[in-house]
């Protein structure tokens, strides 16, 4: 992560985009508050907002570079106070085994040090079930191919929360 490099122009654009998304999410977080009401003497109902303990972010790779997906998913988790954020990125299709350096720069800018390289469904399974080196997460978010979506749906069957099923345009 530390050695990832992008052009000065892209770095500046990523810093600005992260700032914008952070400011929006911080404003949103201020508007979301705990609340409760007493519906009858001694009986209260309401909502208490607490961050989940861990989240896995799947950042697609392949036909294009998607650092925007990285900051759009990671910044809300950072602002919410999620204690552990794990990022899963498929390797670039050039056969080098490397991952998109722009995604690594986003992770570095946000202080995320837990980044793994694996293809779609295998990466989703690793985040959901865990491996010898990857602890399982409570929730997995991120768009992907139909196979990635199917893997996320399968994780739901095993008690891992995921977001709504997304297509390529969401």
What are the roles of these predicted feature ranges?
Residues 111-170:
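Conserved NAD(P)+-binding/catalytic subdomain of aldehyde/semialdehyde dehydrogenases
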Residues 2-17, 47, 65, 95, ...:
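Catalytic cores of large soluble enzymes that bind and process phosphate-bearing ligands
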Residues 13-16, 20-23, 54, 72, ...:
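Alpha-helical scaffold segments in soluble metabolic enzymes
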Residues 29, 63, 93, 123, ...:
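Surface-exposed, flexible loop/turn segments at secondary-structure boundaries
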Residues 85, 91-108, 117-129, 139:
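Alpha-helical recognition segments enriched in aromatics with Gly/Pro capping
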Residues 1-53:
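N-terminal Rossmann-like NAD(P)+-binding subdomain of aldehyde/semialdehyde dehydrogenases
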Residues 35-105:
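Conserved small-residue-rich beta-alpha loop and adjacent elements
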Residues 50-62, 107-111, 133-134, 165-169:
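Glycine/charged-rich beta-loop-alpha catalytic/anionic-binding loops adjacent to active sites
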